[in-house]
Curated annotation (Swiss-Prot):
<dbReference type="InterPro" id="IPR043198">
    <property type="entry name" value="Cyclin/Ssn8"/>
</dbReference>
<feature type="region of interest" description="Disordered">
    <location>
        <begin position="276"/>
        <end position="330"/>
    </location>
</feature>
<dbReference type="Pfam" id="PF21797">
    <property type="entry name" value="CycT2-like_C"/>
</dbReference>
<dbReference type="InterPro" id="IPR013763">
    <property type="entry name" value="Cyclin-like_dom"/>
</dbReference>
<dbReference type="GO" id="GO:0032786">
    <property type="term" value="P:positive regulation of DNA-templated transcription, elongation"/>
</dbReference>
<feature type="region of interest" description="Disordered">
    <location>
        <begin position="343"/>
        <end position="408"/>
    </location>
</feature>
<dbReference type="GO" id="GO:0005634">
    <property type="term" value="C:nucleus"/>
</dbReference>
<dbReference type="InterPro" id="IPR036915">
    <property type="entry name" value="Cyclin-like_sf"/>
</dbReference>
<comment type="similarity">
    <text>Belongs to the cyclin family. Cyclin T subfamily.</text>
</comment>
<feature type="compositionally biased region" description="Basic and acidic residues">
    <location>
        <begin position="508"/>
        <end position="543"/>
    </location>
</feature>
<feature type="region of interest" description="Disordered">
    <location>
        <begin position="460"/>
        <end position="543"/>
    </location>
</feature>
<keyword id="KW-0195">Cyclin</keyword>
<dbReference type="GO" id="GO:0061575">
    <property type="term" value="F:cyclin-dependent protein serine/threonine kinase activator activity"/>
</dbReference>
<feature type="compositionally biased region" description="Basic and acidic residues">
    <location>
        <begin position="460"/>
        <end position="470"/>
    </location>
</feature>
<feature type="compositionally biased region" description="Low complexity">
    <location>
        <begin position="309"/>
        <end position="319"/>
    </location>
</feature>
<dbReference type="InterPro" id="IPR006671">
    <property type="entry name" value="Cyclin_N"/>
</dbReference>
<feature type="compositionally biased region" description="Polar residues">
    <location>
        <begin position="379"/>
        <end position="392"/>
    </location>
</feature>
């Protein structure tokens, strides 16, 4: 929660803040403004927050918290990434000399963003910074956006930010000079001429993720840039060039020990993220990777050997796309992708028929309804049957005489799913619902319900036909068509034009046979001629 003038934490900033005594002590030793670089041990053990009962784990959480807050604030204010990085460095330096227990991190972060905008010549109005910051701080309160627009609330918040700005400037000793690893990183990659775009992007992401740690308080910008390039090359499996006896990392004036430490601290961030997500810990593996970094660095020619914790770009970083997953997970994902492609190749056309894509990119999956897919061979055998009338009309052409065995598969074969979907879209447009965007799963459900409705109608029609056939004593199975002889106009039997199978017979003839329903064999030829159809006589079964 943001500090208000009446809060005790607010008074702690000015009255109880240790920055005055800290300033005096540092001025005596000549520390203030002279150097912002300390060892990791000094930062972790001598932190002012530690003296106020905040342990290392809690402080690490608070550090990541205000980094995330600044990233979100910077994106909403539409400032460059360099401005966001400067604000984060200001915060790190502030809490190097101030305690989290006495200074609200989000108020200090808001001030640092306001200062960073002016330092990097990308200023944002104080009013905009206050409004956006207040909305982020109270994002769970729907009324916060309207409350901050009230004059009394806004004036209180403005007074708080301006007061905190003076505290931040005094704590930093008015030293607002900040250098980032971005410039040396880009300049070095330009010289490599190897996968420049990909290498620069991944290394840039590692630098952005490194801002969430205390690396900027331990190492100079070009050292951090070297570590980011090293990890990016391992992640992309790119071999960095060397000029004779001089290897690439010597361009950064970095020692092997420094390169190792920078790389390992960057990797620790991803290990902590995995642990926070309740995933299996890889602590032992991480220790092994730490020990192996110097050897891999010295023999940098063998860079084809990846680190155990190569990182993958994270979807959680909106503007940076920073890596956040280990190489093990990345390799498993690749393996699953390959297996899926192999499975699709094995399935052939059958697999492609299960999923269809429309022009909008929506996927309609019919594979989930196993009841709609029976014997694929029966569908193939009947694919040459001519279609008449409605595309969803089902005709009994089952050779084995089991009337209902392949009815469902034939229904799916006959029903034109694209036409059904087109009809559904047409109905939506008629209702004035053109602008409405439908989710993929809703579209799938609507289409499946329409298909099921058509199938139910077809099944009912088929049942009616079956009942009529069973009520007739002269019903023929399809296999009996093989021995059926055509009745000519004068009553004589002939086999010249008799189809051998039901597939060879015109569909109108088959339909006429079904609609006869046991009609008398002495129907006149003239009556059949008036209907424009030929009449077949069904011989009585022998024996």
């Amino acid at each position: 929660m943001a500090m208000m003038p009446s809060d005790s934490s607010h008074h702690g900033i000015v009255e109880n803040s240790p920055y005055r005594t800290t300033q005096g002590r540092n001025e005596e030793t000549g520390e203030l403004g002279a150097s912002w670089y300390f060892s990791r041990k000094e930062i972790e053990e001598n932190s002012p927050s530690r003296r106020d009962g905040i342990d290392l784990k809690k402080e690490s959480y608070l550090r990541k918290s205000y980094c995330t807050f600044l990233q979100d604030l910077g994106m909403r204010l539409k400032v460059p990434q360099v401005t966001i990085a400067t604000a984060i460095v200001f915060c790190h330096r502030f809490y190097l000399r101030q305690s989290h227990a006495k200074n609200d991190r989000r108020t200090i972060a808001t001030v640092c963003m306001f200062l960073a905008g002016k330092v990097e010549e990308t200023p944002r109005p104080l009013k905009d910074v206050i409004l956006v910051s207040y909305e982020i701080i109270h994002k769970k309160d729907p009324a916060a956006g309207q409350r901050i627009k009230q004059k009394e609330v806004y004036d209180q918040q403005k007074e708080l930010i301006l007061l905190a700005e003076r505290v931040v400037l005094a704590t930093l000793g008015f030293d607002l000079n900040v250098h980032h690893p971005y410039k040396p990183l880009v300049e070095a990659i330009r010289k490599f001429k190897v996968a420049q775009n990909a290498l620069a992007q991944v290394a840039w992401n590692f630098v952005n993720d490194g801002l969430r740690t205390s690396l900027c308080l331990q190492f100079k910008p070009h050292h951090i840039a070297a570590g980011a390039i090293f990890l990016a090359a391992k992640f992309l499996k790119v071999k960095l060039p060397s000029d004779g006896e001089k290897v690439w990392w010597q361009e950064f004036d970095v020692t092997p020990r420094q390169l190792e430490e920078v790389s390992n601290q960057m990797l620790e961030l991803y290990e902590q993220n995995c642990a926070a997500q309740a995933q299996p810990s890889h602590g032992n593996e991480a220790e092994g990777s730490s020990a192996s970094v110097p050897n891999q660095r010295v023999s940098v020619k063998s860079e084809e050997t990846p680190l155990p914790h190569q990182s993958k770009q994270s979807s959680s970083q909106h503007s940076t796309g920073a890596p956040s997953h280990h190489g093990v997970e990345h390799s498993n994902l690749e393996k699953q992708t390959v297996d899926q492609k192999m499975l699709q190749n094995d399935n052939g056309d059958h697999g492609s028929n299960k999923t269809r894509s429309n022009q909008s990119g929506s996927r309609v999956d019919f594979g989930a309804n196993d009841g709609l897919h029976h014997d694929k061979q029966s569908m193939t055998e009947n694919k040459n049957l001519p279609s008449h009338g409605n595309s969803s009309e089902i005709r009994d052409v089952n050779r084995n005489g089991n009337d209902g065995t392949n009815v469902t598969s034939l229904m799916v074969n006959k029903i034109d799913k694209d036409k059904v979907k087109a009809q559904m879209e047409k109905q939506r447009k008629l209702k004035g619902d053109v602008a409405r965007k439908v989710e993929v799963i809703d579209d799938d459900d609507d289409l499946e319900r329409q298909l099921e409705h058509d199938i139910e109608l077809a099944v009912e029609d088929n049942k009616i036909k079956q009942e009529r056939k069973q009520s007739s004593p002269h019903v023929m199975h399809r296999g009996d068509h093989r021995n059926a002889d055509q009745v000519t106009g004068n009553g004589h039997l002939g086999k010249q034009n008799t189809p051998e199978t039901a597939q060879d017979a015109p569909m109108d003839d088959i339909k006429e046979q079904r609609n006869s329903h046991g009609s008398k064999h002495h129907d006149s030829h003239d009556t059949a001629h008036e209907r424009g159809e030929r009449d077949y006589k069904r011989p009585r079964p022998e024996g």
